[in-house]
Amino acid sequence: MKRLTILLIYLLIFVGCATTKGPPPQEFGGKPDVFCNVIQKPDPLLMGTWESRFLRTVGKSRADDNYVKYRLIKRDDKYGLYFYRTWRDGRKKKAEWKNWTINGKEILGEPRQFGVKIFVQGKDVYFTIRALDKPAKMSRVDE
């Protein structure tokens, strides 16, 4: 009888845990606290969340694994861009809302000296940055 009681208690705990809702997942980036400069409204393909992985050569020969992810949303009549990037094999990270420039089919990063650009070519979205041999094709992230 004691074993049956213990078994029932465990069963009730597991059922209770399975039906309890946890907190809703945080949206990637949360809410914008800064907005983009818009010259021309963004191509609809740029909207939403996109990501890419690519190798970039550092120095003369060392390959550096990079990851980039962004989320472009519209709030009222403004556009917010949350940008997340890792480099130096994940040891360096940057994640923040950006006040970059949107000009139709492209988003230009600031300061321009880093050469960050997200752009539409055909039906695809690409990312490029200084010292990257060729643009990295991005993949849409289902939210």
Regions found by a protein language model. Name each.
Residues K2-Y10, F14-V58, V141-E143:
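Amphipathic/hydrophobic helical signal segments and adjacent flexible N-terminal regions
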Residues P23-I39, K92-T101, Y126-E143:
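Edge beta-strand at a domain terminus
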Residues L46-M47, R71-G80, I102-E106, K117-V125:
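Short, solvent-exposed coil/turn segments at beta-strand boundaries
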Residues S52, Y79-F83, I107-P111, V125-I129:
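Short hydrophobic/aromatic-rich beta-strand segments that constitute the beta-sheet cores
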Residues T57, F83-K92, Q113-F114, R130-K134:
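Short, solvent-exposed aromatic-acidic interface loops
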Residues S61-I102:
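N-terminal glycine/threonine-rich, aromatic-flanked beta-hairpin/loop signature
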